[in-house]
Amino acid sequence: LTTQPVGVISDKMASASLRGARGNSGVILSQFIRGMAKQLKPLEEADIKQVADAIKSGADVAYAAVMKPTEGTILTVMRALSDKALELCGQELEMPAFLEQVIAYGNEVLAKTIDMLPKLKQANVVDAGGKGLMTLFEGALYFLQNNEVIEVQTKEKKAEEPEAPAAQ
């Protein structure tokens, strides 16, 4: 793997996430990444305090981008990640241990989203956007621990052409 400054990587992620955003959670996630990238842009590397500040910036930008923020969604999970990261940034932790604790707390809050919105409770599911956010953080931790990228093959689904009505 090639090594690039964290600021360059985060800037590329912000651009790609906005271009690839799908649905409300995708757009909100792109704003979270944009907020993180803004904080990380000038850096070659990032320490725990800088990552915590970036997560907070991401959550703040995401909340500001939504006209009527709703708790029990991806926003709630973002705020939880931010709160935990800021709480831990004064401790002497290595980055993987820091992320493990941030992720554990994020997953605790994610599990509670089922009770925060009636539609989630009725379907007995957690917020999908929040789950996606946690998967992103878990992937970052996996990479830090294993220095390995998991290749995922995706197919872009194209809209089918409507059939022409039969001539009569």
Where are these regions (language model features)?
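N-terminal loops that bind phosphate or other acidic moieties
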Residues: L1-Q168
